[in-house]
């Protein structure tokens, strides 16, 4: 910065200070200005006071008008009252009602414990759940949530909540809890209401519930918690469990709507169907104590004359397959609430429904711990699939003893342009020895539905809930033997020991399997090996949040597979096996070319002929 610039800046500064000093207001001007602003403040205060008085007067006037209107309302006497609680119960459940709205206030299940493993499970309590019925008359909608009911005709297992216009005109909500059951009958019946309610034969219903987090693992419970419903005469459907979702079902007839947790559900069932159904599910934040925020709007039949009551049901209970299945006993139209227990795709669901569940219940009846039950069940599955395992192994062993001959073919055709000839000669070799390269695939595919059946069954088995085994204190959720003070992407804030053991045994199984199946005929085998080793590592991240019972099953299953492979290899004399194959080659009568090998060989010959024709044309 030069001298001229500095001088210029100093002069500008002096001018600004001088101008500010010369243009300052005098003391008289300052006093006048203060007086002006003070007068404005006084006026504003007066205006605000007048406005407040006016609003108060209008409010009192509106209140008086509303009171005058309410005094002529149908249920004027029920607009004010005391919010009191009434409970009914049986051996398995206790249901509490509130007189404000005449609705279910809380649902407690006596035979199941909450996360503290001390107090019974409470599905909802207080404002966690709401339900309002909208009736109609000339004055508009009558929303039951705004009125006080009276509890009458109460017994240990039933209560009638009455919304009375007068002694002769009322609407009854009749709740009856069945003995030793989670099912509660719900009946709406009008008395003396003909002409006082609109003649429309329906009632609108608004039902909401914030589903509580009832299990330790938020992520996995959230994955299995979803709003589910059944279309009349059709299948069961649900909203997405992975994101906010909603659906307007229009005039589709619906049998029931369920607000589902992993192991428990609140189900609302219509005897005369629900229609005009709109359902919504919203995700809750982890740590809030809730899993999902559910809501449903629907309509159902209602006779204001009272000649025909509205029949409905509530189910507040466990997602236990046989408990839910038993509710259809004696019914012509099945509810199929057992579909709340997800058992997999149709074939896998069939295996679980008719085989896995019955075998599991039979083993559980011995009084064994659930860890031992899973161990025995896994061994039984391995015994069932052993013939397919043996066939797969023998196919691999045959390929292995023919490896030297395949290596000779590879040396014979080292050039890429001879790949077709090389492949044809390899297939010819397999055909001569009666070996199919796909011989081990079909047995593996036959095992898949059985193995997948347990994968689907274990996470849905409420019998595993809060059952401990070894270091796992609950087989229905993850077993965290290491907890991190931070969150690792895709892994979470813990490490499951059974998941880690499952990963290690899978790596060992992969290593052992790859050494047995290495024919050396394909150069891309190296990349395939890396993929096979990478998959167990991926399983560690995917299954770390899964139930420890599931990871325990996979760990034991893989361990048995490794042991089976070692045993088969030690008991299989590969020299004798090669001699048997050589004998088959020499005796054409013993040869039986497989359909796949024959078709593949024919296709290769046809391809070679086409290539030869192209070369001849050139």
UniProtKB/Swiss-Prot annotation:
Transmembrane parts of this sequence: 3-23, 340-360, 365-385, 442-462, 481-501, 523-543, 548-568
Entry keyword annotation includes DNA damage: no
GO cellular component, one term: plasma membrane
InterPro entries in the cross-refs: Membr_insert_YidC, Membr_insert_YidC_N, YidC/ALB3/OXA1/COX18, YidC/Oxa/ALB_C, YidC_ALB_C, YidC_periplasmic_sf
GO molecular function: membrane insertase activity
Localization in the cell: Cell membrane
Keyword vocabulary terms for this entry: Cell membrane, Chaperone, Membrane, Protein transport, Transmembrane, Transmembrane helix, Transport
One Pfam match: 60KD_IMP
Coiled-coil ranges from the UniProt annotation: none
GO biological process: one example: protein transport
Membrane topology qualifier: Multi-pass membrane protein
Job description of the protein: Required for the insertion and/or proper folding and/or complex formation of integral membrane proteins into the membrane. Involved in integration of membrane proteins that insert both dependently and independently of the Sec translocase complex, as well as at least some lipoproteins. Aids folding of multispanning membrane proteins.
Assembly behavior: Interacts with the Sec translocase complex via SecD. Specifically interacts with transmembrane segments of nascent integral membrane proteins during membrane integration.
PANTHER family to which the protein is assigned, alphabetical: CYTOCHROME C OXIDASE ASSEMBLY PROTEIN COX18, MITOCHONDRIAL, OXA1
Family: Belongs to the OXA1/ALB3/YidC family. Type 1 subfamily.
HAMAP family, A to Z: YidC_type1 (MF_01810)
Full protein name: Membrane protein insertase YidC
Gene: yidC
């Amino acid at each position: 910065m030069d001298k001229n610039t500095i001088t210029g800046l100093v002069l500008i500064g002096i001018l600004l200070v001088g101008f500010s000093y010369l243009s300052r207001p005098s003391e008289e001007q300052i006093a006048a200005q203060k007086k002006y602003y003070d007068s404005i403040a006084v006026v504003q205060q007066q205006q605000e006071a007048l406005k407040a008085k006016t609003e108060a007067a209008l409010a009192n006037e509106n209140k008086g008008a509303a009171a005058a209107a309410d005094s002529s309302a149908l249920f004027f006497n029920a607009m004010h009252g005391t919010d009191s609680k009434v409970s009914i119960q049986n051996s398995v459940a206790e249901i509490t009602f509130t007189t404000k709205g005449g609705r279910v206030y809380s649902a407690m299940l006596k035979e199941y414990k909450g996360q503290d493993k001390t107090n019974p499970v409470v599905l909802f309590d207080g404002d966690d759940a709401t339900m309002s019925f909208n009736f109609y008359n000339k004055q508009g909608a009558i929303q039951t949530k705004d009125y006080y009911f009276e509890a009458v005709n109460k017994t240990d297992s039933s209560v009638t909540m009455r919304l009375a216009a007068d002694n002769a005109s009322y609407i009854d909500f009749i709740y009856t809890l069945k003995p030793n059951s989670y099912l509660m009958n719900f009946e709406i019946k009008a008395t003396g209401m003909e002409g006082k309610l609109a003649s429309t034969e329906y009632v609108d219903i608004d039902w909401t519930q914030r589903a509580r987090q009832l299990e330790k693992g938020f992520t996995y419970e959230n994955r299995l918690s979803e709003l589910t419903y059944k279309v009349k005469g059709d299948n069961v459907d649900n909203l997405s469990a992975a994101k906010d979702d909603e659906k307007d079902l229009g005039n589709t007839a619906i049998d029931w709507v369920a607000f589902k947790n992993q192991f428990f559900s609140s189900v609302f069932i219509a005897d005369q169907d629900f229609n005009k159904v709109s359902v919504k599910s919203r995700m809750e934040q982890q740590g809030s104590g809730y899993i999902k925020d559910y809501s449903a709007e629907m309509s159902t039949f209602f006779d204001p004359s009272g000649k025909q009551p509205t029949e409905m049901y509530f189910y507040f209970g466990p997602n236990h397959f046989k408990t839910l299945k038993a509710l259809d006993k004696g019914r012509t139209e099945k509810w199929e609430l057992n579909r709340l227990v997800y058992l997999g795709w149709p074939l896998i669901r069939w295996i679980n429904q008719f085989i896995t569940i019955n075998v599991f219940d039979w083993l559980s009846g011995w009084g064994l711990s659930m860890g031992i039950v899973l161990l025995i069940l896994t061994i039984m599955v391995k015994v069932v699939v052993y013939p397919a395992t043996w066939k797969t192994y023998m196919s691999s062993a045959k390929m292995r003893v023919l490896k030297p001959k395949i290596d000779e073919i590879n040396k014979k055709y080292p050039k890429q342009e001879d790949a077709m000839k090389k492949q044809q000669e390899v297939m010819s070799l397999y055909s001569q020895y009666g070996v199919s390269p796909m011989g081990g695939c079909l047995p593996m595919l036959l095992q898949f539905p059985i193995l997948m059946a347990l994968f689907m069954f274990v996470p849905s088995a409420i019998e595993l809930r809060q059952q401990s085994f070894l270091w796992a204190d609950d087989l229905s959720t993850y077993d965290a033997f290491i907890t991190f003070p931070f969150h690792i992407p895709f892994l979470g804030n813990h490490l499951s020991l059974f998941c880690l053991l499952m990963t290690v045994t899978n790596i060992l199984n992969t290593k052992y399997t790859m050494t047995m199946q290495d024919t050396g005929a394909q150069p891309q085998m190296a990349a395939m090996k890396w993929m096979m080793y990478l998959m167990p590592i991926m399983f560690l991240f995917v299954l770390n949040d899964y139930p420890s019972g599931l990871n325990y099953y996979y760990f034991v299953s893989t361990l048995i597979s490794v042991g089976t492979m070692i045993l088969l290899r030690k008991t299989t004399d590969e020299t004798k096996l090669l001699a048997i194959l050589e004998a088959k080659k020499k005796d054409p009568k013993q040869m039986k070319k497989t359909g796949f090998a024959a078709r593949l060989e024919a296709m290769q010959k046809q391809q070679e002929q086409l290539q030869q024709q192209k070369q001849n044309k050139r």
